[in-house]
């Protein structure tokens, strides 16, 4: 799907210390290009995604509004935004050849943090994941509300565990 990335210079940035509404307002204020929230990671941490110039402008506005930190992420695409509609369409097409079996365990959607009720809409939701923000805050809250209190991260870093800790009191 890398070959389906739109042309242009794209970036993502994590804004820390502002709430969701403040970050959404920042994105609306940006005049230099496309930028939108892409990941609602935790209370006080939202990742934005968009054109490089727009990210730079959003960073400036965020700092003026009192953001504790803005960190540019090492990415090269407008992930979790409508700019990846062609990738979403390509995935949707590929998923037509995939059989989704009944879940053996509960599965939570990144888009809204809700559990899948059945497998009927899995393919649609997977394709929508590419063009919609990740709502990790709601995912973690739903897991906690359903009695899940142990999180294991498999990977080279501990980014997800840090975000999980910010979403819990543990």
List where the protein language model places each region:
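Flexible, low-complexity segments
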Residues: 128-170
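Alpha/beta catalytic cores of group-transfer enzymes, especially the acyltransferase/condensing modules
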Residues: 1-132, 162
